[in-house]
Amino acid sequence: LISGITANKYDVVMTGTSMTVSRAKAVGYTLPWGRTGYMPLTQKKNAGRFKTWEDLNDPNVTVAYNLGTSFEEFVKRELPKAKVKRVESPARDWQELVAGRVDVTISSILEASVLAQKHKNLVPLFGDDVRNSVPLGFLVAQDDQVWLNFMNNWVMMKTSLGYFKSVNEKWG
């Protein structure tokens, strides 16, 4: 996503992009429009195996993440004892989970909700203990202040109309 913005392949990334300092060095962010956090996702048959985040930090647990994502940084920092499977794009970490090649993947609240609806054998864990709460913003080019101003005004208008509140209520 970042490389597409910096290469001028597109003007805006409107996914649930978490704000990080490292990303902000390369791209611009709009004003925040919501928050997200990280939660583990596993197969339903394994849900009883994991009661807390600490249960994931175990050499007998394989955790998948996509290279170059904020999830990679999180897993390295918070789950250093876990066995990891690094997944390179265009493949996705959750595909490894669906296929049963890993025990867990770390996902955003939104993506975990969508994946659990789409793949009935997956279940999010620890919904009451979401980690790494961060603001969400849309990505734009750093050097286009006019476009950033437009996008910020759009975010403010949509926020005042309750649009993002309804999106967050629907998707978590």
Across the structure, where does each feature detected by a protein language model lie?
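Acidic, polar ligand-binding/catalytic clefts
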Residues: 1-55, 123-131
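Bilobed "Venus flytrap"/periplasmic-binding protein-like clamshell domains
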Residues: 17-18, 35, 39-90, 109-111, ...
